[in-house]
């Protein structure tokens, strides 16, 4: 991630990460202060998470994850990471049945708390009405979506790692998705690095199906949006 995220200039505290076993942990301290300080930090963190999902997927490493919020303790040199948000994120992540990520209730509650604070702001800044201006809900990197779990789909909030993340973070080192065959595109990533998917492996095939369905919907909608903004429609 280092050297790619220009949005880090907007955040007072950088996003950190460490890896243990097959787990990647992204974490970021929330700065104390008003929503005008906290909202950019959240946007940068979500950008980092979405970029990690996309970068790993492009390299044939489909990830799944969850974003939580709360008090935690971390000691990287000992691989120690504890706290309620760790448990919540692990529980939600482990039950998902796709390559993707969702926002946990604790994080969503925090977003809405900052949204309410943002709507109470008064005044103007360079002609912009400050009421709602710093709302963290004004972010293209999440979408309401039926999250696929092992038992069923549950309405929730998904992180967007389709081509919107490339434009959001001004990235040009990763090519946009150029195919409309999302099923084949996703399957190729799941089969990267010599992996094979057995015909009887219904569990993995369902993950591919769920991932392709999400990616297809998001990518198609985003392509139409870009065309409409450019006047091509």
Can you describe what each PLM-predicted range is?
Residues 1-4:
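Short catalytic helix/loop segments, enriched in acidic residues and glycine
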Residues 6-44, 53-84:
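Catalytic core of nucleotidyl cyclases, primarily class III adenylyl/guanylyl cyclases
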Residues 9, 14, 53, 91-93, ...:
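Homeobox/homeodomain signature
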Residues 39, 77, 87-88, 107, ...:
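Alpha-helix boundary/interfacial micro-motifs
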Residues 58, 64-65, 69, 86-107:
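Catalytic/regulatory signature loops of cyclic-dinucleotide turnover enzymes
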Residues 81, 85-94, 113, 120, ...:
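Conserved binding-pocket/active-site segment within a compact domain
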Residues 98-99, 103-233:
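Intrinsically disordered, glycine/charged-rich C-terminal tails and inter-domain linkers
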């Amino acid at each position: 991630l280092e050297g790619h995220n220009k949005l880090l200039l907007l955040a007072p505290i950088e996003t950190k990460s460490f890896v243990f076993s097959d787990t990647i942990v992204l974490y970021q301290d929330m700065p104390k202060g008003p929503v005008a300080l906290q909202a950019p930090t959240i946007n940068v963190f979500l950008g980092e998470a979405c970029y990690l999902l996309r970068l790993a997927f492009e390299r044939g490493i489909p990830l799944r994850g969850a974003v939580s919020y709360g008090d935690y303790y971390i000691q990287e040199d000992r691989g120690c990471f504890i706290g309620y948000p760790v448990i919540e994120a692990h529980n939600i992540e482990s039950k998902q049945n796709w390559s993707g990520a969702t926002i946990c209730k604790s994080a969503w509650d925090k977003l809405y708390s900052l949204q309410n604070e943002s709507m109470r702001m008064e005044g103007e800044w360079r002609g912009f009405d400050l009421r709602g201006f710093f709302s963290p809900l004004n972010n293209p990197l999440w979408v309401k979506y039926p999250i696929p779990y092992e038992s069923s789909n549950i309405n929730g909030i998904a992180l967007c790692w389709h081509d919107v993340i490339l434009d959001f973070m001004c990235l040009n080192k990763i090519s946009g998705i150029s195919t409309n065959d999302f099923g084949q595109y996703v399957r190729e990533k799941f089969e990267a690095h010599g992996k094979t998917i057995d015909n009887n492996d219904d569990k993995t095939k369902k993950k591919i199906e769920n991932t392709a369905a999400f990616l297809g919907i998001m990518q198609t909608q985003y392509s139409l949006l870009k065309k409409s903004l450019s006047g091509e429609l």
